[in-house]
Amino acid sequence: MKNGAVIIPAAGSGTRMKLDYPKQYHAVAGTPIIVHTIRAFNKHPCIAKIILVVPQDHLEESKALLQKYQLENISIVTGGARRQDSVLRGLQEVPESIDIVLVHDGARPMVSAELISRCYKGAQQYGAVIAAVPVKDTLKRGAGRIVTGTVDREGLWQAQTPQAARKALLVKAFKENGMRNVTDESTLLEGVGIPVTLIEGSETNIKITRPEDLILAENFLREKKEPMQKIRIGHGFDAHQLVEKRRLILGGVEIPYHLGLAGHSDADVLVHALCDALLGAIGAGDIGRHFPDSSDAFKDIYSIRLLESVMQKVGELNYKIGNADISVICQAPKLAPYLKQMQEIIATSCACQISDINIKATTTEKMGYTGRGEGISCHAVVLLQQ
């Protein structure tokens, strides 16, 4: 189950890039740098919340950018004088329910889903981690232009982001060490005695700082956009009988009706069909294999919990939902007033945007068992992207 948030500080200037606007708004491969960065986290199965920290005078521009690129469920706050002030403002927006907080530079658009996962899982295991790569080049110490010594690179690492920690540890670090000027969160954590574990970063996960960095980013992101994504498609179907003395739950929503669906769980045909579609897409059988009706553990369970479990399996294979199309076949009751609420619940459970989930209801014009009001059925088709 996703329990992570990411703070993306993007309140810097474009001075070293020789721009008259913040570098994160500069387009690379046809898309602003900050949009590339947000997209890397937006559908990641571990990330439940994104907090974007931007300059005060670019707040409205940032809001318009998110709307233009249909980036939903993102909180925007304005930054402070120092990076750590910006991160602290973002940290104050992290929900109480979140356990793991990642911090990632807005100008590192080439971060991979695999690196995000490594940092998230590393923080779960160790408490605090930092993405880094071993220093490969020979390092020289100098005074002016004169070499005064060679630095032993043994044990030296080049820090990157994401940097991740349990929220409580990060809050402690800011409370006890926040007045000190630092360049990253790891230094804050180290300063209060919290061990920070090195996580293998990536040579391509560069921070765009100088004009020449744009050449690498342009080539990398353009190549990344061009190949066809690995996709998988699944179809699911479920049907349950309508009976007395049962609640009617569809798409996680309780619907007022004198009949409910019979079943071992809450018999939510919509969620069950979607679970089967997801399991089918990843080649993992069906819902009965994973949640058998012979187990008391699933007796009367709210099926959204089953969906969250299935999505965890999907995420472990580094897949995410591209879109899902769901058709409920039901003569009565009328479902139209409840479809938006269903859509919101499903999107939240699947860690995707509301626009990625389409739910529609139809009838069989009083033909067959659904037409006679004996039951409700549902078809679901889902596309997964890696």
Swiss-Prot record:
UniProtKB keywords: Isoprene biosynthesis, Lyase, Metal-binding, Multifunctional enzyme, Nucleotidyltransferase, Transferase
Catalytic reactions of this protein: 2-C-methyl-D-erythritol 4-phosphate + CTP + H(+) = 4-CDP-2-C-methyl-D-erythritol + diphosphate; 4-CDP-2-C-methyl-D-erythritol 2-phosphate = 2-C-methyl-D-erythritol 2,4-cyclic diphosphate + CMP
Binding site residues for a divalent metal cation: 238, 240, 272
Annotated site (Transition state stabilizer): 16, 23, 264, 363
Cofactor dependency: a divalent metal cation
SUPFAM superfamilies with a match to the protein in the record: IpsF-like, Nucleotide-diphospho-sugar transferases
Keyword Transcription regulation (UniProt): no
Lyase found in the keyword field: yes
Coiled-coil stretches: none
GO terms for biological process, alphabetical: isopentenyl diphosphate biosynthetic process, methylerythritol 4-phosphate pathway; terpenoid biosynthetic process
Region (2-C-methyl-D-erythritol 4-phosphate cytidylyltransferase) residue spans: 1-231
PANTHER family: 2-C-METHYL-D-ERYTHRITOL 4-PHOSPHATE CYTIDYLYLTRANSFERASE, CHLOROPLASTIC
Similarity comment: In the N-terminal section; belongs to the IspD/TarI cytidylyltransferase family. IspD subfamily. In the C-terminal section; belongs to the IspF family.
Protein name listed in UniProt: Bifunctional enzyme IspD/IspF
UniProt organism field: Desulfotalea psychrophila (strain LSv54 / DSM 12343)
Gene from which this protein is expressed: ispDF
